[in-house]
Amino acid sequence: MGESSFTVLRDIGSLPLTENEEIRFSIDVYRGFRYVSVRRYLQTDGFAGPTRDGLTLTVEIIRVLEPKIAALPDDPKSVEDGQLGKFAKRQGSCVVVAIGSFKGKRGLALRQWQDECGWTKKGIWLPLEHLKEIKALFRQTREALDEQPTDDF
C-alpha cells in the first residue's frame, strides 16, 4: 500500500435517513494514520456514493466523545441543547460537538473549527430522533478501535 493511499479498514454501520440517503461510520487509514469517517452517502439515478457532508475524527476524539454521547438520556426530548465538547484534531483545528436545532429538527452537530478562519465546511448533522442508533454506532466504533488492528498500514 502506498504512503499516501486511502483505505477503508472497516465499515462500522450506517444510519438510514431516507430511502436513498444514509450516514456511514467507518474506520479508515490515510498516510499510516487510523481515523473514523462519519459521512453522508446518497443513491440516486445520477449519483451513488459519498457526499461532501461529513468529517473525520481521530481515534482519541472517539475515545473521549463516545462516553459523552452514551451518557445522554435515551429519550431525545429530554436531551438539553448545548455543547458536548470541543476536541483537538490537530494544531489549529478542532471538532465541536453540540446538540441543537436546524430547520425545526433537533440533532447532534459535529463541526470542524479552524483557529485562523472559524467554522469550516466540514461537518455532519445527526438527527436526534435516531439517538439510540447514534449511540450504538459510536459505541461500535469505539469497540472496533479498541480491538488490535489486523492490517499493517
Predicted regions and their residues:
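Positively charged, low-complexity terminal tracts
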Residues: 1-153
